[in-house]
Amino acid sequence: MSHPYESFMREAAELAERGRWSAAPNPTVGAVLVRDGVVVARGWHTAYGKSHAEVECLKDAEAKGVDPSACTLVVTLEPCNHQGQTPPCTEAVIAAGIRHVVIGLRDPNPKAAGGMECLAEAGVEVEAGVCEELCRDLVADFLIWQTTKRPYVMLKLAMTLDGRIATRTGHSRWITGETARHQVHELRANVGRAGGAILVGGNTLHTDNPLLTARLDDPVERQPLAVSISSRVPAPDSLLLFKERPTETIFFTTASGAATPRAAQLRERGV
């Protein structure tokens, strides 16, 4: 049997998606205020350092003349309970007079957690675990970092139906179409917005000679960090990534490779 606030949590999750790439390193969060079975205010975390979803939702309610004390707050992630770039969301929720809060997922960040207990101590009825898997997927990258201190990794792979990326002789051509390539550049731009990186191995670096940048019709807000790994240290002018330096670049190689004159030349160029 579904929870009575499940549909509202799904709407909050859709709102959270709007901040997926811009909220980093914070998690993406969405919130709605519900009164008499109707969503009357909405909010999401738009960018790091700006108001969190709960506060944005309360601002929307104020702009619409909605009394939040007569509403239920539905939010995808437990309201934060600490002073960071912004004040604790729990304070805003309590000050607004909200008496019922429905949460999708508890916050895995020990610095921000404790919101549920804080609200309960203030007399707020709190429910958690509504659409938990959906809300967990929303913040998969944040969860991995908080629990393992590892980066969230996405694999981009293009191959033929028989699992090939080139012929036996090494000859290759575009496998993906124009639409897919455009989507890849959109993904690169979003990864850059989130402060992420693109990583390639030595074969891709030396064979494809990639720039590892996002190239779209509109200006790209922030290019992703370019990272490559190879036991072969290239001459700085032999590859576009090091010759043109279109973005911040990191090159990993062996200890012996790092001691070569070519490696010294790369360092001189800021790699």
Write out the residue ranges for each language-model feature.
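Short beta-strand scaffold segments in enzyme catalytic cores
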Residues: 29-37, 157-158
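Zn2+-dependent cytidine deaminase-like catalytic core
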Residues: 33-134, 225, 245, 250-257
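Short, basic/aromatic recognition patches
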Residues: 4-24, 142-145
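Short helix-terminating capping/connector loops at secondary-structure junctions
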Residues: 24-26, 66-70, 221
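Short, small/polar residue-rich loop motifs at catalytic or cofactor-binding pockets
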Residues: 25-28, 152-153
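Flexible, polar/acidic helix-loop-strand segments at domain edges
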Residues: 139-152
